[in-house]
From Swiss-Prot:
<protein>
    <recommendedName>
        <fullName>Flagellar P-ring protein</fullName>
    </recommendedName>
</protein>
<dbReference type="InterPro" id="IPR001782">
    <property type="entry name" value="Flag_FlgI"/>
</dbReference>
<dbReference type="GO" id="GO:0009428">
    <property type="term" value="C:bacterial-type flagellum basal body, distal rod, P ring"/>
</dbReference>
<comment type="similarity">
    <text>Belongs to the FlgI family.</text>
</comment>
<keyword id="KW-0732">Signal</keyword>
<comment type="function">
    <text>Assembles around the rod to form the L-ring and probably protects the motor/basal body from shearing forces during rotation.</text>
</comment>
<dbReference type="GO" id="GO:0071973">
    <property type="term" value="P:bacterial-type flagellum-dependent cell motility"/>
</dbReference>
<feature type="signal peptide">
    <location>
        <begin position="1"/>
        <end position="15"/>
    </location>
</feature>
<keyword id="KW-0574">Periplasm</keyword>
<keyword id="KW-0975">Bacterial flagellum</keyword>
<comment type="subunit">
    <text>The basal body constitutes a major portion of the flagellar organelle and consists of four rings (L,P,S, and M) mounted on a central rod.</text>
</comment>
<dbReference type="Pfam" id="PF02119">
    <property type="entry name" value="FlgI"/>
</dbReference>
<dbReference type="GO" id="GO:0030288">
    <property type="term" value="C:outer membrane-bounded periplasmic space"/>
</dbReference>
<dbReference type="GO" id="GO:0005198">
    <property type="term" value="F:structural molecule activity"/>
</dbReference>
Length: 362
């Protein structure tokens, strides 16, 4: 019966796997951060006279090896050392000995971390405990080059890099995965329709009352107490395919780049729109006034300005009841509206109450 239910769920028109639209409460990654030194740079490290914390960190490291820096050497210039921040994501269920990728970023005035080596750096969580140790050679995608005449070229970002598998996990994060007789599924996008369909799908497959919707974004599911059975149980649930509810109609506008995204369910109530362009041009054409001979006059520059205003007439187009996305785009393209004009039209439609969607400007 269980196999038949899974096979029937796979033939949904727009079905998505449960693992793609929801996550298990408490099963998540944790952010780690650390502070360390990158050495071995080819003269592109921090200018330690301007970043004293780099030199202080370097001296502290030497003292751990029993090396004492003589007094009065605070102005030493180290060109191959850079102070960096190290960040990583500790995956859920990560165990000691496993490797995780890390990102290394300069926090001083280093020009490039290319060719550098990160020295042993502890990575801490928000609770202050050390969960991983990082060290290794950096992989930097960008580079920086400068000529003697001051000409300079920079490709990508040379002041940051990554170390694949550069951190070793030293401590695992406690998880409540095996606690209690139930699990909570959190939807990536809250939707009452999607939550109801998930509950119905699970209950149809496993029996009434197994799944209960807490709200539009969370679902409580009864789970076995045995850890092994719980893993098998979730492997079935996460591959269950559900038809998610349609998203709320939205129009997203990026005012900086001119990008406009119109959702599938966006419609317009009856409205008539016209959009014209007014261009004002001001030109300066000064003339020189030259007095006649023996007139005791002085040469003067007389300003002369010309102001010209041109307005490009645009035809009016009409939206009927329930106009769809395709009709909106077709009508706007017919009048040759630029992205900036389309933004103004959509904002005006929203103010008029004709745009049946959320207008979001980012």
């Amino acid at each position: 019966m269980l196999a038949a239910a899974l096979m029937s769920a796979a033939f949904g028109a727009h079905a998505e796997r449960l693992k793609d639209i929801a996550s298990i409460s408490g099963v998540r990654s944790n952010q780690l951060i650390g502070y360390g030194l990158v050495v071995g740079l080819n003269g592109t490290g921090d200018q330690t006279t301007q970043t004293p914390f780099t030199l202080q960190t370097f001296n502290n490291m030497l003292s751990q090896f029993g090396i004492k820096v003589p007094p009065g050497s605070g102005n030493v210039q180290l060109k191959n050392v850079a102070a960096v921040s190290v960040s990583a994501d500790l995956p859920a269920f990560a165990k000691p000995g496993q490797q995780v990728d890390i990102t290394v970023s300069s926090i001083g005035n280093s020009k490039s971390l290319r060719g550098g080596t990160l020295l042993l750096t502890p990575l801490k969580g928000i609770d202050g405990n050390v969960y991983a140790i990082a060290q290794g050679n950096l992989v930097v995608g960008g580079f920086d080059a400068e000529g003697r005449d001051g000409s300079k070229i920079t490709v990508n970002v040379p002041s940051a890099g990554r170390i694949p598998g550069g951190a070793s996990v030293e401590r695992s994060v406690p998880s409540g995965f095996n606690q209690g007789n139930s699990l909570t599924l959190n939807l990536n996008r809250s939707d009452f329709t999607t939550a109801k369909r998930i509950v119905d799908k699970i209950n149809d497959m496993l029996g009434p009352g197994v799944a209960q919707a807490i709200d539009g974004g969370s679902i409580r599911v009864t789970a076995p107490l045995d850890p092994s059975q719980r893993v098998d149980y979730l492997s079935i649930l996460e591959n269950l395919e559900v038809d998610p509810g349609q998203a709320v109609a939205k129009v997203i506008i990026n005012s900086r780049t001119g990008t406009i995204v119109i959702g599938q369910n966006v419609k317009v109530s009856p409205a008539a729109v016209t959009h014209g362009s007014l261009t004002v041009t001001i030109t300066e054409d000064p003339i020189v006034s030259q007095p006649g001979p023996l007139s005791n006059g002085q040469t003067a520059v007389v300003p002369r300005s010309r102001v010209n205003a041109e307005q490009e007439a645009k035809p009016m187009f009409k939206f009927g009841p329930g106009t769809t996305l395709d009709e909106i785009v077709r009508a706007v393209n017919q009048v040759g509206a630029a992205p900036g004009d389309l933004m103004a039209i959509l904002e005006a439609l929203k103010q008029a109450g004709a745009l049946q969607a959320d207008l979001i400007v980012i």
